[in-house]
């Protein structure tokens, strides 16, 4: 259910936040601007109440704290109420923009130095995450906010982070999954690294490493075709031994 302006949401640590306004929504939930003891924060509120395993893992992540300052990490967990729950995190500063804006050329980096800095920041963030014993599991182009002037990066949507070897239950996007995960495998830090290479390729080339002539010729990208093009029959667009999926102007992001 949608929350109302002025509504109070109780936290497991005590106290409550007050809803100010909606900031945005997606497939999993709604993000609200909230007031926490006079400080502005963001609340992610789930459209569907998660199961106990997910909720307890989220609670543990709040206790453990963020692997680094690059993560917009869950800071507080709400009680289960009004048919669902959510968590509190820091707000994204206004000078940071979604990665998709860079892919669509709505935003551009101020310099190559800034672009390289963004790549290094993303790699460092996930290195720290893995050092803490976590796997991200749902790495995609919607997980990053970037400052185009400096290349500084903030990593969001960290509620799906799980201990290495465990599965969050959140299905990622096939375009960013390792082929074995598309086929039904369990995500881990190694599949995270595959997804990371896809992100870096897209950052530098503004195109997907598996999207060339084959995907352009696809009449409709159904789930079965996704499993084929990103899983069982994935072909790198610059594969030296297979030119069947070379870059196509229509396939550029």
Locate the predicted segments by residue.
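The N-lobe alphaC helix and its flanking beta3-alphaC-beta4 segment of protein kinase-like domains
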Residues: 46-70
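Conserved structural core of kinase catalytic domains
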Residues: 72-118
